[in-house]
Amino acid sequence: MKKTLLTLVLACAAMAMQAKDGTQIRRNQVGCSPRQESAVVIEGTNPGSKLRVKTPSGKVLKAKSVRKAVSPLSGKVRYVCNLGVLPTTGDYRVTLGTEECVLHVSDHPYRDVATASLRLFYLIRSGIAIEMGGDYNRPMGHPDTYVLVHNSAASPLRPAGTVISSPYGWYDAGDYNKYVVNSAFSIGLMFATYEQKADYFAQLNTNIPESRNQTPDFLDEMMFNLRWLLTMQDPYDGGVYHKLTTPNFEGFIMPKDCRQTRYVVQKTVTATLDFAAVMADAARLFEPYQQDYPGFSAQAAAMAERAYRWAKENPRAFYRQEQLREPAVTTGGYGDGSATDEFFWAATALYRLTGKQQYLDDARQNAPRSFTTPSWGNVASLGAFEWLAAEGSALRETMCNQLMDYCNKAIEGVATSSFQSPYGNKKSDFGWGCLAEFNCCQALALLYADQMLGTEKYRRYALQNADYLFGRNATGYCYVTGFGDKSPMHPHHRPSEADAIEKPFPGMLVGGPNPGQQDRKDLNGAAYPSNIADESYVDAMQSYASNEIAINWNASLVAFLCWLDATD
């Protein structure tokens, strides 16, 4: 009897928690295609035959099937309602009791959010005035024409205190610094999708100052960051500075109001190899666009090879922020204790560019034993994507087999998952930047699998990850700013907070639920609503652990959504 009573109490408590945000129906708030299966998830209560779906013409549909699912993370009961393919474009009204919401069905449901996620990079450009940003126009900040060489980066020909110019580039995340590791990784990840879908990007207009030239807007945007990266290589030895930074994070102020001195710090093997990889790729991909960027491909190729030589001579030059003094530096570290994955990516990119045997040998020596989703701390999959893009390449079969092993394991739990998606079914799916590294990048891997097989078997699972991202999840949030009915309004992003505009920059992917809650003591009155892994998210400006934005996270969103949009 006691056990029964306890079970009843827990069940009632769970239902009360589920109803806290007032929505029982969880669905993709952005939209879906008339060629894909749709589903909604009902929190707590079996909808039975009460769920109604009204088509654009007024016809009433019922769910084709209803499946009970119990969350392995919270124990909460949910009901996955399969609606099947909704073949007519328009708005479908979903009702359950007094609750109603809309499912948007269109031929290109992800076009707007994909474009916004790429255009975000224009809005966060450093060193120029933003004049084509509409409400988000702002004066120039951080010209970075007066940057000091930190003593950690000093060399005989560039001693500490040397003034260099290092303009342009993108602000990295919620802060105003620029980091080579993350910048190079972000470009490399987006290049991977560009190589697969170049025709799509050739037609994509993001309304930026360069839109009238002969180069795709996507490549123009990458060039704005590449121009900065070129300045981060020491011209005397080929090593690359780890980052351009202030000693401490700026406050929540606009770029024009920032006053701290900025430095380039310590040359590192990881930054140098990431630089080498992305410059080698850029040399190839910009070759057809000499009219707009004369001489760039040759310059990038030469600088990539020089960087690689420096890395071979300095294989243990890892970033050690705790050793930096006069001044000490406390901004983002992007530290790494292994360069095996960076050597693999850089050697792969340089082999594709030059065909030199030494690079093939190095790629083979540093090749991964299994596929992992791409992150700035493990870039091996960027090398894998390069081998997959090259027909008949030396390591293509090995990389393909590793990818297929990963993808087949990723989809194993979908049939019983609470939100009908490969992502979000275990605690390890959640943490810092999880929506990028584990959702978007997992989906990107699934799309690559179909590309390799010439099928659409895995695309349906990638679409399910998009459903999760856009609202069919435990919090009911669409995790991209400016889209959906319920999206983040207070991201940890300095210009969005300081610009006196109510809405944040659109098209930003936030980090997502993070049970680590590393910022819980810094929330200044805000609080996480739950310790449950998939509910541990708070839409508060102070939440850098769950609500920050970053270029690498948006790069994963661009890579994923542009691929989806290109194949709709």
Regions found by a protein language model. Name each.
Residues 29-97, 101, 107, 123-188, ...:
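Aromatic (Trp/Tyr) and acidic
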Residues 20-30:
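Short, compositionally biased P/S/T/A/G/V-rich stretches that sit at domain boundaries
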Residues 216-237:
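Carboxylate/His-rich catalytic cores and anion/metal-binding grooves
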Residues 9-18:
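Hydrophobic h-region of N-terminal signal peptides that target proteins for export
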Residues 367-373:
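Solenoid-like repeat scaffolds
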